[in-house]
Amino acid sequence: MGKEKTHVNLVVIGHVDAGKSTTTGHLIYKCGGIDKRTIEKFEKEADELGKGSFKYAWVLDKLKAERERGITIDIALWKFQTPKYYVTVIDAPGHRDFIKNMITGTSQADCAILIIAGGVGEFEAGISKDGQTREHALLAFTLGVKQLIVAINKMDSVKWSQDRYNEICKETANFVKKVGYNPKSVPFVPISGWNGDNMIEASTNCDWYKGWTKETKAGEVKGKTLLEAIDAIEPPVRPSDKPLRLPLQDVYKIGGIGTVPVGRVETGVIKAGMVVTFAPANVTTEVKSVEMHHEILPDGGFPGDNVGFNVKNVSVKDIRRGNVAGDSKNDPPKGCDSFNAQVIVLNHPGQIGAGYAPVLDCHTAHIACKFDTLIEKIDRRTGKKMEDSPKFIKSGDAAIVKMVPSKPMCVEAFTEYPPLGRFAVRDMRQTVAVGVIKSVEKSDKAGGKVTKAAQKAAKK
């Protein structure tokens, strides 16, 4: 069998018509986990509807529709392989909640693919001031997606013009630099997601294209296709050696077993026999067993695993979604009284001042928080201070803000526990701002509930 391939998570960003579905569909279709039967079924349907030529996007649209109707389609459909990696596409945008998903996302992306439409007029629209492209790229960078690949799509529509390609590369390089990426470490690939040029095999339509290069710590890496660029992602480091943080998605009561909290391990490891503390509930108890997909995990749950674990002497009323479990003996999680965050306002119709109290989505918590003090306005790219104690901030601004939650919540500094240190600010049914937590004022509440099981385990 050999060693299992490393898993990486990709997020695909770009303007609404850049061809994200077709390109992603093509990769999944050619290198992916969609079984032949499903493909044949979709192709037949596409042909019957006269959408035969549209098959990649059609396959993806079908999957998307099923996903949105809440049919939990086999998640393998969103996976494909490169020689080195198992790749999961964690969000194909065009999704209303794309921004929220990216922040509270079920997982952190290791790399973003920015798809740019090369068509005349299309490129200009996608990258314009108010373009979604800018917002998505900025988000990816702010939220710690350190690696980027740029695919310049629809090159067939400009007859594989080298001049057009160079013009777009130059503009896009400036664009990604403004967002915060170093263009030298970003591969640029001209593709046709539709016809498949430079997707998996090198194209015969652009003799002028000599391939992409990117600078890495280990030196220069070269390749030709989009698949090779994905294969050249630098392997991500998974935080299993950090203390445990496991935000709860749900808490179930299961007859004959008892209370079973469920969630995704973000950092550290959760094992049977461990004594965990839930914050901000301030409840401490012993973990009896840990399982995933109804199978016991003898070695415990690791970062990225969605696990259920059985706890003793705790009722469903004691803990809830949005609580965070951690190791009671190793930097246990705590509730917070306030926290300071770098907030970037994306789209708010008015001005935001002290006293504004929208809902924050941070990991699985969904809690109203007050903008207590606007400490300073900063330059979004460099982080340098521009103004002390601004009265207001508006769309496009970045500021350091002291936030006070309306009820107990557990968050962490982004530098220490990234998934618990980024949040979306929701108001008027949209994401109006995003934030990265700089520091947390933790509440040291004495007392709290320590179960008999925990006391017993401590004596062992």
Swiss-Prot record:
tr-type G domain boundaries: 5-240
Annotated region (G4), positions in chain: 153-156
Region described as G5: spans on this chain: 192-194
Modified residues (N6,N6-dimethyllysine): 3, 317
InterPro entries: EFTu-like_2, G_TR_CS, GTP-eEF1A_C, P-loop_NTPase, T_Tr_GTP-bd_dom, TRAFAC_GTPase_members, Transl_B-barrel_sf, Transl_elong_EF1A/Init_IF2_C
Chain intervals for the UniProt region annotation (G2): 70-74
Keywords, ordered alphabetically: Cytoplasm, Elongation factor, GTP-binding, Methylation, Nucleotide-binding, Protein biosynthesis
CDD domains the record matches: EF1_alpha, EF1_alpha_II, EF1_alpha_III
Modified positions (N6-methyllysine) in chain numbering: 3, 30, 317, 391
The keyword Phosphoprotein belongs to this UniProt entry's keyword annotation: no
Ranges where the record places region G1: 14-21
Residues that bear N,N,N-trimethylglycine: 2
PTM annotation (N6,N6,N6-trimethyllysine): residues: 79
Source organism superkingdom: Eukaryota
Record: residues binding GTP: 14-21, 91-95, 153-156
Pfam families: GTP-eEF1A_C, GTP_EFTU, GTP_EFTU_D2
SUPFAM superfamilies (UniProt xref): EF-Tu/eEF-1alpha/eIF2-gamma C-terminal domain, P-loop containing nucleoside triphosphate hydrolases, Translation proteins
Gene3D superfamilies found in the cross-reference section: P-loop containing nucleotide triphosphate hydrolases, Translation factors
Region annotation (G3) ranges: 91-94
Cellular compartments per GO CC: cytoplasm
Family of this protein: Belongs to the TRAFAC class translation factor GTPase superfamily. Classic translation factor GTPase family. EF-Tu/EF-1A subfamily.
PANTHER family from the UniProt entry: TRANSLATION FACTOR
General function of this protein: This protein promotes the GTP-dependent binding of aminoacyl-tRNA to the A-site of ribosomes during protein biosynthesis.
Name by which UniProt lists this protein: Elongation factor 1-alpha
Native organism: Yarrowia lipolytica (strain CLIB 122 / E 150)
Lineage of source species: Eukaryota, Fungi, Dikarya, Ascomycota, Saccharomycotina
Gene name of the record: TEF
